[in-house]
Regions:
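Short, well-formed alpha-helical segments that are part of the catalytic scaffolds
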Residues: 15-30
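A conserved acidic beta->alpha catalytic loop
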Residues: 43-51, 69-71, 114
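Hydrophobic helical membrane-anchoring modules
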Residues: 1-4, 192-267, 277, 302-330, ...
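Short acidic donor-binding/metal-coordinating loop in glycosyltransferase active sites
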Residues: 104, 112-115
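Short aromatic/hydrophobic "clamp" motif used to bind/position activated sugar donors
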Residues: 107
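Short loop->beta transition adjacent to catalytic acidic/histidine clusters or analogous donor-positioning motifs
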Residues: 4-6, 27-40, 60-63
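Acidic helix N-cap motif at the loop->helix transition within catalytic regions
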Residues: 17-21, 46-56, 74-77
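Acceptor/aglycone-binding surface of glycosyltransferases and processive sugar-polymer synthases
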Residues: 72-101, 118-197, 222-227, 232, ...
């Protein structure tokens, strides 16, 4: 039925109980559809019997890639079992390894816990062959569904995560871990560095996949094993989103972060002014403490978060950038004061607060431009990370 052979990538960690059922269903699918199939199990060194199962019971189309953080002993590979050393743990890095090492042109990613129906793989493949760049097994298109015992907060969590990803894709379920794409599109990816579980969204952004289709599926809650979706993973998703925003919308993302840091500086300023005033300090000292602490706070946050690729290391480098930051802040403050004063004198009916806001906006833009293009100028852009082994 299909022109292209298929590689199925299955990332695992302590999923031994689910693998026989998954392999059985994939085997039936292969026989029924005449599908040329390989299954790559990417295991994060579970030591739960997965290796013994592959060696003794798994069908011949299953290959096991054991990922470890440490180095490997020479000659540790077998015919169907390969060990990969120096690998960070995690679902997303495992998927990237699997996509890189797969043999076939059509690549399918799915979970091992049987929440994704293998019987939908033909629909994904046919949609790819019809011209889609990526096809997602979706819970949220017409015909898609989840088990009835999904609680409100789980549903809300999924919807919020999807809404936060909307600037990158119109797909209804970009969070899905069940999707297919071509090797040729995967190999166009730039700077792959996913965090957490949402590797599909990473590929949509980094492979520039604009033609994304969706096939309805019923998402089944796992019966065996334990869910890996924890609060830690949800926080990792937020970090991942930040990276993607910085990748796709670099200038606007860094400007928004710069503005947020500036807003936090106002809070720091007022806090220290209040504390010093309550301690009985003279007004000039209270005001000075607020200014100095907010400058240091703003610099530290911008150095750490807004311009991470351009920060200098070592005491001398940090002090050099701090001096530049203070200089840029002085230029911005001077512009803010001058413009506000000019507006007040030129338009006497203009409220003072409006003039002040105009000055703040102009000062912030100039301050940001000086910091980005001079103080935190990136001389050597980071090289894209290599994929593969």
């Amino acid at each position: 039925l299909f022109r292209s052979p298929v590689s199925v990538i299955v990332p695992t960690f302590r999923e031994r109980e689910n693998l026989p059922g998954l392999a059985e269903r994939l085997g039936r699918l292969r026989d029924r559809c005449g599908l040329e199939l390989e299954v790559l199990v990417l295991d994060d060194d579970s030591r739960d019997g997965t290796e013994a199962w592959v060696r003794a019971e798994a069908p011949d189309f299953v290959r096991l890639l054991i990922r470890t953080e440490g180095s490997l002993e020479p000659g540790s590979d077998e015919a169907r079992i390969q060990r990969l050393g120096g690998r960070p743990r995690g679902l997303s890095p495992a998927v990237i390894d699997g996509l890189s090492m797969a043999r076939h042109e059509v690549l399918v990613v799915m979970d091992a816990d049987l929440s994704h129906p293998p019987e939908k793989i033909p629909s994904l493949v046919l949609a790819l062959e019809a011209g889609q760049q990526m096809v997602i097994g979706s819970r949220y298109v017409p015909g898609g569904s989840t088990d009835d015992d999904w609680g409100f907060f789980r549903w809300l969590n999924s919807k919020v995560a999807t809404a936060l990803a909307r600037p990158f894709t119109d797909a209804k379920d970009p969070m899905s871990g069940f999707f297919a794409l071509r090797r040729s599109d995967f190999e166009r990816a730039r700077e792959l560095n996913p965090v957490g579980y949402k590797v599909g969204l990473e590929l949509i952004v980094k492979c520039s996949l604009e033609n994304v289709g969706e096939v309805p599926i019923h998402f089944t809650d796992r019966v065996l094993g334990q869910s890996k979706l924890t609060l830690k993973e949800q926080l990792a998703y937020l970090r991942h989103l930040r990276r993607l925003y910085m990748f796709r919308y670099a200038t606007w993302s860094s400007f928004v972060q710069f503005a947020l840091v500036g807003a936090s500086g106002v809070v720091v300023n007022l806090t220290f002014v209040t504390l010093f005033a309550l301690a009985g300090s003279p007004e000039w000292l209270a005001l000075l403490s607020g200014i100095l602490t907010s400058i240091v706070s703003n610099f530290a946050l911008n150095w750490r978060f807004t311009f991470p690729d351009a920060r200098m290391r070592g005491t001398r480098g940090v002090l050099q950038q701090f001096a530049g930051f203070v200089g840029a802040s002085s230029v911005g403050a001077s512009l803010q004061y001058g413009l506000a004063l000019l507006l007040v004198r030129s338009f006497p009916a203009l409220p003072l607060q409006v003039a002040a806001l105009a000055g703040i906006a102009a000062g912030m833009v100039v301050n940001y431009a000086i910091n980005r293009y001079f103080v935190f100028k990136t001389k050597h852009p980071p090289r894209p990370k290599k994929r593969g082994v």
